[in-house]
């Protein structure tokens, strides 16, 4: 049975831990609001960009750009896995890594070649355990205080270069789509060959200089926009998951403090009772 001193030290230690988790929860809540606003603001632009590209793509025939039609092969798959740079965010990283592992295993079973590009240290650490030979690169965002379109452009340049060089036939990004503080949806989205959903409209458009020229210019931007949207969704999901995880940790610390305090009071009461009995017994002996 632990001594009163041990119990008191443990209560103090858990209280200090609770202060830390509470502070982290508050920081995550502040960051979540900014990240959520950025993700929600980017969605309409990405949807409109996709609708325009889909409208242009619908009129393309055999001469469609390679980014849209593909290169005629389906052998080399590049998986871009987006996770966080830091931990303490519950199952945020493990869920997306699990989805990427599942897809990679399915592709290997089909005889495909899998390559992996990670964004975020935590995904790199987990995937390198059993997919080290498939790694082709890593994007470090640890020094980025606020995600910008330039971050997405850098990743887009890498995957576009791999596609143009024949080093990747299909590119799929893996990220957590933000729904709420307690709900982040692991998502796999193919970006090359490009897939965009057409908007439901009866409007007819005239394009200048030509549909082909505009499409050739928009497709690389569309890939970068999809990656940027995924980065923002992932960032909001990370802060939501961290806020939820730290809230749970704070609650658990409070429960543990209550239990330890009860145990401390009972032990202290037992010690006092024992001392009283010894005093009374000594007095009776006299």
Swiss-Prot record:
Natural source organism: Fuscovulum blasticum
CDD domains found in the cross-reference section: F1-ATPase_gamma
Any one of the GO CC terms: proton-transporting ATP synthase complex
Ranges in a coiled coil: none
A biological process term (GO) from this entry: proton motive force-driven plasma membrane ATP synthesis
Compartment list: Cell inner membrane
Name used for this protein in its record: ATP synthase gamma chain
InterPro entries: ATP_synth_F1_ATPase_gsu (IPR035968), ATP_synth_F1_gsu (IPR000131), ATP_synth_F1_gsu_CS (IPR023632)
Pfam families: ATP-synt (PF00231)
GO molecular function: ATP binding; proton-transporting ATP synthase activity, rotational mechanism
Recorded superkingdom: Bacteria
Keywords per UniProt: ATP synthesis, Cell inner membrane, Cell membrane, CF(1), Hydrogen ion transport, Ion transport, Membrane, Transport
